[in-house]
Amino acid sequence: MSDNIISFDHVTFTYPDSPRPALSDLSFAIERGSWTALIGHNGSGKSTVSKLINGLLAPDDLDKSSITVDGVKLGADTVWEVREKVGIVFQNPDNQFVGATVSDDVAFGLENRAVPRPEMLKIVAQAVADVGMADYADSEPSNLSGGQKQRVAIAGILAVKPQVIILDESTSMLDPEGKEQILDLVRKIKEDNNLTVISITHDLEEAAGADQVLVLDDGQLLDQGKPEEIFPKVEMLKRIGLDIPFVYRLKQLLKERGIVLPDEIDDDEKLVQSLWQLNSKM
């Protein structure tokens, strides 16, 4: 039996003055310790999901729907308990900075939790080191690069020891190298701390590395499954305006020419190796 850390049960949410729901009767579950990618076009409801998970928003009718995080049903009396379990890294880290230095910013969440100062200093030093920013502990966040700022934002979340990290378009403003560095960092942190990661993105290359993919379209769950189950559905993804990852585009083109590669070919390295093996047999 799977251990689900997050579950949505028939969740509908409508923004004030909006003529239609942003989410409509949405149900899904996320397994503890997994990496889930939530994909969809702009306006599909992805970021609304992240705000509901963290209690920043509430479903239209809690009597007809429920959101559960780490065994706690989200409600007015449990919202702060849930928020301690979930950390969000947003698209623009500048909007999250509150401290004069990197260390001050990382300490902010601990101060709100009244963590004793000696313990706080140890936690901050460890969190800053874990994201490779120890040399910048006394720097002003405004002087950092985009990738460095995201590292500091991740350190601030890591310091308060959440169960879930949500990357809400967190790499969309970074160059390809910076993006991959941040994703590699989060993968390591996830494994070292047994965290659950939710990546909200329209970048399917990023989503290809997830354990599970949820596809949203106009506030509804269009499909879900492993990347190798979702990405071959080229027409569905094109219809909702998403670009297919290169590996899956090439596999589709080869398939149309009678060359079928194994399902487990899901990244560039495996693709190159498979093509070399195929070439050696010709």
Curated annotation (Swiss-Prot):
Top EC class of this enzyme: translocase
Keywords assigned: ATP-binding, Cell membrane, Membrane, Nucleotide-binding, Translocase, Transport
Binding annotation for ATP: G40, H41, N42, G43, S44, G45, K46, S47
Record keyword Hydrolase present: no
InterPro entries the UniProt entry points to: AAA+_ATPase (IPR003593), ABC_transporter-like_ATP-bd (IPR003439), ABC_transporter-like_CS (IPR017871), ABC_transpr_CbiO/EcfA_su (IPR015856), ECF_ABC_transporter_ATP-bd (IPR050095), EcfA_1 (IPR030947), P-loop_NTPase (IPR027417)
Gene Ontology MF, one: ATP hydrolysis activity
One Gene Ontology cellular component: ATP-binding cassette (ABC) transporter complex
PROSITE patterns in the cross-refs: ABC_TRANSPORTER_1, ABC_TRANSPORTER_2, CBIO
Localization annotation: Cell membrane
Protein role: ATP-binding (A) component of a common energy-coupling factor (ECF) ABC-transporter complex. Unlike classic ABC transporters this ECF transporter provides the energy necessary to transport a number of different substrates.
Family annotation (PANTHER family): ENERGY-COUPLING FACTOR TRANSPORTER ATP-BINDING PROTEIN ECFA1, HEAVY METAL TRANSPORTER
Binding partners and assembly: Forms a stable energy-coupling factor (ECF) transporter complex composed of 2 membrane-embedded substrate-binding proteins (S component), 2 ATP-binding proteins (A component) and 2 transmembrane proteins (T component).
This protein's name: Energy-coupling factor transporter ATP-binding protein EcfA1
